[in-house]
Design a protein with these regions (language model features):
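Active-site signature of cysteine proteases
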Residues: 43, 165-382
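N-terminal regions that are enriched for targeting/export leaders
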Residues: 24-45
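Sec-dependent signal peptide recognition
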Residues: 4-10
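Papain-like cysteine protease catalytic cores
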Residues: 83-189
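Solvent-exposed loop/turn segments at secondary-structure junctions
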Residues: 66-67, 92-94, 127, 136, ...
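Second-shell loop/turn segments in exported
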Residues: 45-57, 100-108, 228-235, 244-245, ...
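C-terminal motif of bacterial Sec signal peptides marking the signal peptidase cleavage site
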Residues: 17-18
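Active-site nucleophilic cysteine motif
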Residues: 54-68, 107-114, 301
Length: 382
C-alpha cells in the first residue's frame, strides 16, 4: 500500500510505510481508553486472534484472510490461515517474472484484497499453525534480497531451476521450512489447493466500490496503484454500497474494508473513534468523487469490519486491525459511517453477505445491467 506520513495515535507514534509501521510503539488500549465507546450489548463477529503485520505491506492479505476466517467461524467451522505461506508464494512468483523480464519489474508485497483470492486459488493455503509468520522477519529486506538474488541469476543466465533452488534456500532461512506437501485437518488429508477450496472458492466473494466516473452496476478495473491484477469491482451508488456493508454486518457477516487512513481523525482518534472533520459533511457521491480524483483518498490500508453500533445519531463500524493487540482497543478501532462514506476505496464480502435479502433480486456478480435494481427502492423495507 502507499507510503504515508507519521501518524500519531494518542501518545503513540506509528510510522506507516504503506500499511505497515515500525514495531516500537505503545498502544492506547494499555490505558483502557476507548472501551466506553463500545456498548456492552453490541454483538461482535467472532474472529481468530488479532495478528501483527509488523512493518510489512501485507495488510491486504491479513484483512482478507481474517474476513474468510470469520465467515467460516460464523458457520461453525474454525479455521486460521497462514500469511507466511501466501507471502512466500507471492515472492516466488514475482521472482520468476522479474527474471524473465530481465529486471524490468519490481518485487513488492503490496496488493489488494481480491489478490488474496487469486493466490490461494492458484497456490492453495496452509493452516496458521503449520506455517506461522516468524515475528523477526522484515519483509521489505526480504524483497531486496530476492531482487539481488534474481539480479545475480540474470547476469549469469542461470536458468529458473537454479533460481528456484536458491530462492527456496533463502525462504527457508528467512521465513521457515515449508510444511509437508499435504494438509492434515480433522483426520483428513488435503493438498494445499484442496484445503484452500474448502475454505474459499474464487467466486465465493464479491468486491464492491462506488465511483461516478464509471457506470453504476457494472464491473470495472479499479484505478489504484496496488490493483496489480486489474481486478474488476462492482460499481454501486454510494448509498447502495453503504447499505450492503450495514446489512452484511448486521446479519453477522464480516466485511473486508480497503481505504484511506490519512485523515486527521485517524491520526488522533478520540477513544478509538475515528470521524471526519465537520466541514466534510454531508458526504455525497460528488464530494467522495472529488476526494478520489484529487488524490486525497488513496488506497492505504485494509481492515476487517466485525461490528456496528450507534453513538448518539452517528453510526460507527468496529474494525479489526492487523497492528497487534497493543494498538487501539485491543486491536480494534471504530470508523464512523461518514468516514466510510468518504474514505472507502472498496469492500469485499461473501456472496451470501452480498445477497442479504434473498426475496429481492439484487445485482449478482457479472450480471447484465438490465438484471439489476435500485436498492434505494427497498431501503425502508429492510
Amino acid at each position: 500500500m502507499e507510503r504515508k506520513n507519521i501518524i500519531t495515535i494518542g501518545l503513540a507514534l506509528l510510522v506507516f510505510a504503506g500499511c505497515g509501521y515500525k514495531q516500537q510503539r505503545t498502544g492506547i488500549s494499555e490505558t483502557g481508553r476507548g472501551e466506553d465507546y463500545l456498548p456492552e450489548h453490541i454483538h461482535l463477529i467472532s474472529t481468530t486472534p488479532v495478528k501483527d503485520q509488523g512493518n510489512s505491506e501485507l495488510c491486504w492479505a491479513y484483512g482478507m484472510l481474517a474476513t474468510i476466517e470469520s465467515e467460516h467461524i460464523m458457520k461453525g467451522d474454525s479455521v486460521n490461515l497462514s500469511i507466511a505461506y501466501i507471502a512466500r508464494m507471492m515472492l516466488e512468483e514475482q521472482a520468476m517474472e522479474y527474471y524473465f523480464a530481465q529486471g524490468k519489474k519490481n518485487i513488492s508485497l503490496r496488493g489488494t484484497a481480491p489478490m488474496l483470492i487469486h493466490y490461494i486459488d492458484k497456490y492453495g493455503a496452509q493452516p496458521y499453525d503449520s506455517y506461522e509468520d516468524p515475528k523477526h522477519i522484515n519483509y521489505k529486506v526480504l524483497c531486496r534480497k530476492v531482487q539481488k538474488l534474481c539480479d545475480g541469476a540474470i547476469s549469469k543466465k542461470a536458468g529458473i531451476s537454479q533460481l528456484k533452488e536458491e530462492l527456496n534456500d533463502l525462504f527457508d532461512a528467512e521465513i521457515g521450512y515449508m510444511p509437508a506437501k499435504s494438509v492434515h485437518m480433522l483426520g483428513a488429508e488435503y493438498t494445499p489447493q484442496e484445503f484452500a477450496h474448502s475454505v474459499c472458492y474464487p467466486e465465493e466473494y464479491v468486491s464492491l466500490t462506488s465511483f461516478s466516473h464509471h457506470p453504476y452496476r457494472e464491473y470495472f478495473a479499479l484505478e489504484i496503484p496496488d490493483n496489480r491484477m486489474h481486478d474488476a469491482y462492482l460499481n454501486l451508488p454510494l448509498d447502495e454500497l453503504m447499505l450492503h456493508i450495514r446489512k452484511a454486518v448486521e446479519k453477522g457477516h464480516p466485511v473486508c474494508w480497503e481505504g484511506d487512513i490519512s485523515e486527521p481523525g485517524f491520526k488522533a482518534p478520540q477513544k478509538n473513534c475515528v470521524d471526519i472533520q465537520p466541514m466534510e459533511r454531508p458526504v455525497t457521491q460528488a464530494s467522495r468523487q472529488k476526494e478520489f480524483e484529487q488524490l486525497r483518498t488513496t488506497d492505504d490500508h485494509v481492515m476487517e469490519i466485525i461490528g456496528t453500533f450507534m453513538k448518539g445519531k452517528q453510526r460507527f463500524y468496529v474494525c479489526r486491525n492487523s497492528w497487534g493487540k497493543n494498538w487501539g482497543n485491543k486491536g480494534l478501532i471504530y470508523l464512523s459511517e461518514d468516514y466510510l462514506r468518504l474514505k472507502t476505496i472498496a469492500v469485499s464480502m461473501s456472496e451470501e453477505a452480498y445477497l442479504y435479502d434473498r426475496s429481492v433480486r439484487l445485482v449478482v456478480p457479472y450480471s447484465s445491467p438490465k438484471d439489476s435494481i435500485n436498492l434505494l427502492s427497498i431501503y425502508n423495507k429492510v
